[in-house]
């Protein structure tokens, strides 16, 4: 079971995941004079200094903002890294909020994580939400646990390898508009 899956199931903490993956790698490669904690700190710092938009992403989130849609980021990522990426990419000015699991007290896909998210979004009901994500285990299962609609972003068309409900599936982000505004197809 991968480190991230073990985080999702509550078996590991975020630090055990982020440091443990380097510790395991170094053990497998026989590297003994490198501190996985320091490598992880350096990695997280540098990871926060780069970003890229997936095709159609910047245009889509900007268009949705202009149309009045409220948009939130839900992530199991590292808080400092996510905050840096949000600012660097300009998404901090587009998104209405960011919910990082380490600050919420629970990882995606736990129901408690989403309960905490909804508690921080006054006036937002589950019935008006859709979770768009690329992970079957954290995003689609999370949507199911949260009681919201789900849209699996599956750009490569891979087969489902996990039994989980997906309400929609898209290959390109621009396809989301037809789901949100079906009468304007």
What annotation goes with each model-predicted range?
Residues 1-55:
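N-terminal helical cap/lid subdomain that shapes the substrate entry/recognition surface
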Residues 1-3, 37-41, 61-62, 94, ...:
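A short alpha-helix capping/helix-coil boundary motif
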Residues 10, 48-49, 70-71, 127-128:
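A generic structural signal for short
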Residues 28, 67, 120-124:
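Alpha-helix C-cap/termination motif
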Residues 42-46, 67, 78-81:
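Conserved acidic, metal-coordinating active-site core of Asp-based
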Residues 56-68:
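Catalytic-core regions built around general acid/base machinery
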Residues 62, 72, 77-185:
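Asp-based, Mg2+/Mn2+-dependent phosphohydrolase catalytic module
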